[in-house]
Amino acid sequence: MEHYSLAQLSKALHNREFSSVELTQHCINKIQSNKDLNAFISLDEDQALKEAQSADLVLKNGEGKPLTGIPMALKDLFCTKRLNTTCASKMLANFQAPYDATIVTKFKQNGAIIIGKTNMDEFAMGSSNENSYFGSVKNPWDRERVPGGSSGGSAAAVAGNLVPFAIGSDTGGSIRQPAAFCGISGIKPTYGLVSRYGMVAFASSLDQAGPFAKSAEDLAMILHCIAGFDSKDSTSVDRVIPDYSAEIKKPVDKIRIGLPSCFFQPQVEKGIQDAIHDAVKLFENLGAEIIEIDLKLQPLWVPCYYVIACAEASSNLSRYDGIRFGHRSKSASTLIELITNSRSEGFGNEVKRRILTGTHVLSTGFFNAYYLHAQKVRRLIRDELITTLNSVDVIIGPTTPTTAFKLGEKINDPIQNYLADVFTVAANLAGLPAISIPTGFENKLPIGLQLMGKHFSESRLLAIAHHYQQHTNWHLANPNKQG
């Protein structure tokens, strides 16, 4: 079952080759036998099996939808009525939301079975999934290495064949970077395409939900399910959603690919540079036009991103004061002590670091110098990317400058962790869609290829990624069968 695509799983379930109960139990067994990955924070086994039984009845009557009866995992920052929503933080370790996030409701309406919620960096702040109150997640390809972050649990669950697909969030690369490190496919949609209602906020102008799966074809199937306008999300865009699964099957011709020289810097591992150049050659052999482009503002991407992201995090996380919800300190005799102690005890070191940074850049005397300046630079970055994408279909490059690094290797060096996002943050700053797909290995560790496109060009982006995967087998590699 674990080698089936989503379309194949759906067809097999509809043809009654095996039942949803059998598939769901298979996933539960895989999760239980791979607990050392630490990919999940919570499981809902009994409810998942009940929903699988219901799905089998629907399928028996020939009334199922494409995702009916297929188990999935959800990053633990999407609100769910049944399961706690912890954000991998002591602050919310026992928090149970009174409602379901829109994305959860959509999956339920489409018959998917939420089997559990995955581990992550605390409040989605991190690039290694080592900043979790519930412990680090391990990479299925090498259990001594990180899976990437912040959606590391979701990526590890898919790469380890624990579930067919999973949902994550991407604020500066938190879907694409783990997808690259774990050798799977992941897409960050255009800002506003997928509802953020019920997704706990890190940086509201940057956050976007998106799927992990083995292939671009699978991503198209999931994205069609979750995309669309939501009146509960003021940033949601009201536009017609195409059938992405149908769109990617159309002929892909006259592809214009932008290749930035600034993506091939000395700090990018040579094996990664070679893999990207090989991918570019393959596209060229398939008839694509390769156009060298110059992104002059690329050196400003990371500093601009971290000023804005930390500022928004500081504002968003001010709601956790130990009074209305979240961890409440037991060692406080005054209101100020209650708030101070609750936040000191409830937040981890990386979250505290970003709150302090954000508060600093928003403070009197520094607002104009840092935050306002970063917002101006953000507009320039956005304009440069949009102008560039008027002459090419996609911008190609590595998803990350390195392959997955060892657990603990960079935990005490936040700057090195932040630089893991050097190629991914721009898509968030500009609100553009971007996808990471597997494109080779270096020392038996996966390499990710990133494609970034115009606003709402998901159909084209997925089609190009699918075109690449039709001519390569990298996305079929399995960590359980390596060397």
Swiss-Prot record:
Keyword Cell cycle: no
UniProt xrefs under PANTHER family: GLUTAMYL-TRNA(GLN) AMIDOTRANSFERASE SUBUNIT A, TRANSAMIDASE
The protein's name in its UniProt record: Glutamyl-tRNA(Gln) amidotransferase subunit A
Domain of life: Bacteria
UniProt KW keywords: ATP-binding, Ligase, Nucleotide-binding, Protein biosynthesis
Gene: gatA
GO cellular component term of the entry, any: glutamyl-tRNA(Gln) amidotransferase complex
Catalytic activity of the protein: L-glutamyl-tRNA(Gln) + L-glutamine + ATP + H2O = L-glutaminyl-tRNA(Gln) + L-glutamate + ADP + phosphate + H(+)
InterPro entries tied to this protein: Amidase, Amidase_CS, Amidase_dom, AS_sf, GatA
Disulfide bonds: none
Biological process according to GO: translation
SUPFAM superfamilies in the cross-refs: Amidase signature (AS) enzymes
PROSITE patterns to which the protein is assigned, alphabetical: AMIDASES
Top-rank EC class of the record's enzyme: ligase
GO MF terms held by the record: ATP binding; glutaminyl-tRNA synthase (glutamine-hydrolyzing) activity
